[in-house]
């Protein structure tokens, strides 16, 4: 039996876009120089100072997917390395959602951080080219039945596109598509009693036909 099949085996899943914020990891970096070192390494691959961007912005630039992706890759690896330095348990499985797949590859040693940052910068540029900023949007829908979200997306689409993009967990779905269609879907969901539906801080409608 391999480690992944053992009872209580640890799995780490790295996140995708949307969790970036100005000042992220600032406090940890004051205690652990390895945080900033990871950002510097990733900056060499991305061709931009990711630490300066993540600490001082501008926020609009950090929110553009070609910069969001390498910045979050750097953040994920910085935390992963700190986990290792602090004696964190060795996971049996490393995985990731969307961008997080690249973070998992770097953490597993299949890619260097520099190469990973270079790749996701290009990935972000290609995604932004497919749907220029402002064209698309994404939103998280909490506490709604899958069938309701799917029906609302169909109703809101019209001549545009809005679809369930990610089924994150029971009761948590991310929708995405044309910005106006996403807005229509959010309004319909509120009308139908959905308790929480919020726009995400992303500049492209990932995992939708617009990509």
Locate each region found by the language model:
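Gly/Ala-rich beta-loop-alpha elbow adjacent to hydrolase catalytic centers
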Residues: 76, 92-100, 104, 112
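Alpha/beta catalytic cores of group-transfer enzymes, especially the acyltransferase/condensing modules
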Residues: 17-19, 46, 68, 108-211
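A short small-residue
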Residues: 55-62, 103-104, 196-200
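Short, glycine/charge-rich beta-strand/loop segments that flank catalytic centers
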Residues: 59-60, 95-99, 124, 136-140
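Helix-rich "cap/lid" substructures immediately adjacent to catalytic or cofactor-binding pockets
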Residues: 2-95, 175
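An amphipathic alpha-helix/helix-turn recognition signal
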Residues: 37, 71, 98-99, 111, ...
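Short acidic, glycine/serine/threonine-rich loops at helix termini
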Residues: 25, 106-108
């Amino acid at each position: 039996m391999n480690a992944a099949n053992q009872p209580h085996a640890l799995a780490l899943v790295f996140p995708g876009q949307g969790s970036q914020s100005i000042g992220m990891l600032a406090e940890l970096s004051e205690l652990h120089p390895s945080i900033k070192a990871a950002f510097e390494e990733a900056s060499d691959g991305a061709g931009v100072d990711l630490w300066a961007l993540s600490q001082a912005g501008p926020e609009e630039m950090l929110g553009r997917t070609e910069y969001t992706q390498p910045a979050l890759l750097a953040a994920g690896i910085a935390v992963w390395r700190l986990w290792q330095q602090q004696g964190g348990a060795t996971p049996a499985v490393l995985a990731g959602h969307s961008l997080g797949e690249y973070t998992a590859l770097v953490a597993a040693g299949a890619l260097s951080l520099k190469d990973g940052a270079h790749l996701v910068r290009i990935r972000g540029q290609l995604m932004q080219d497919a749907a220029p900023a402002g064209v698309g949007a994404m939103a998280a829908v909490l506490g709604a039945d899958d069938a309701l979200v799917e029906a609302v997306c169909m109703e809101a689409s019209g001549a545009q596109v809005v679809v369930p993009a990610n089924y994150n967990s029971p009761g948590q779905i991310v929708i995405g598509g044309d910005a106006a269609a996403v807005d229509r879907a959010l309004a319909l969901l509120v009308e139908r009693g959905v308790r929480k539906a919020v726009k995400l801080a992303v500049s492209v409608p990932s995992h939708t036909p617009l990509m």
